[in-house]
Amino acid sequence: MPCKRTICFIIIALSLKLIHAVRQRGTVIRFDFLGILLITYYLSLITYQMSTQPKIIVLDDDPTGSQTVHSCLLLMQWDVETLRLGLADDVPIFFILTNTRALTPTQAADVTREVCQNLKSAIAAEGIKDFLVVSRSDSTLRGHYPVETDVIATELGGFDAHFLTPAFFEGGRITRDSVHYLFIDGVEIPVHETEFARDSVFGYSHSYLPDYVEEKTGSKIKAEDVERFLLPDIRSGTQERLLSLQGNQCGVVDGEKQADLDIFCQDILAVAAEGKRFLFRSAASLLTSLAKLGKQPIPAEKMAEYKPTSKPGVVLVGSHVQKTTQQLGELLKQPGVAPIEVDVVRLRDQPGERETMLQEILSQVKAAYDAGKNPVIYTSREELTFADVQQRLDFGKQVSLLLMDVVRGLPKEISFLISKGGITSNDVLSTGLGLRSARLLGQILPGCSMVRTGESHPQFPNLPVVLFPGNVGDKDGLATVYGRLSG
């Protein structure tokens, strides 16, 4: 299809020809004026179209993918009418929180399929023509790849390529020469050498992304067939190469700093304007470059301004990765906290004690709150073993249900809620708080989003909620966020 600039020049040429024709008929003033109006109208239209970004639709497998943007909508439901809210919103990006990382591969595929089918109806109803689709997932390569991207490609079809872009600079994740690294205590570690690669559900053996793709696709995509977009390529421009891609070609993308993805996304958007269609399997930093939203309204250090009361707040810690455990230890050293442990071994071994456990936890929360303390509710830290992945997922749901009952039983005038862990945060938004959608305020710490409930929320109106991923931040990260909100 011709590009918008070409169309613009054609319109100008035709308009000038019209003016010339009417000059020869002797009605110069009247038709010159009409011709100028015609040119102005079409130039304005084309300029608007050229400056308008495509809608960026993010299917987020937990609620932390918005950790580099602000002001957009997070949708906890995906019926057609709710999706239309996101599509019609003035902000160019919105997130659909599918929480598929907490599901089995089959369940993840079913949810993704339902979202895509509803999206097709919502896109048609809103008359959206230009859009990009991002399957947002973990910057440490955990998640249902290629299950989700395969379903998206089938349902929304016609993609020329899909790209893996796992760089997340705020969290210390970079990609160089197609190898994905984590910074741990200032040292670059190939991601396959970290605890995340040993995840009992999403484990893997490779940091070299083409090999990771071959491993995860069961050799359906060979490593040698993966297009590698290296730093020198990106920094010198990739438009011609992007234009040549077709047939949902798999590509992997380097990134050492945000400027690298800025350049890459500039080329992506230019080529997309020519009619190419791309799908992304991405961490959060790509979204910064695609959305181009600028600075958030209130800086991180001053986000306590969003608190509706001066009462104590609550911290809920569900994530059990080593980084979270370290951060929890530092948090519990802070003044004004009241530690409340949820004994998950007791829940597993004595499921009949669940209601008793719930009442015990809520009693401790009330006592701490009444004493002016900030309750820190956290699951016991031992990593439990199960016979298979399904048993582990099922028990994880039982833990989550208990924690969400705790959320629903919190004092109504708490001033903030910090949720630690991606899956925990999703459940807090969709189940504990029962939200259909929420507006993102921004980041209170690099990689940590804050949203706020609406004024009409039946239990916690205008409550700021921090979505803190389990694998983000240094050892003082959780204590820093707590300090910014409790001070």
Spans of features found by a protein language model:
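Structural signal for terminal/edge beta-strands and the immediately following C-terminal loop/tail
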Residues: 437-439, 451-487
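Conserved, well-structured core segments that form the ligand-binding/active-site neighborhood
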Residues: 181-361
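C-terminal structural cap/anchor segments
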Residues: 365-368, 372-422
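Short, flexible loop segments at boundaries between secondary-structure elements
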Residues: 283-292, 302-305, 442-465
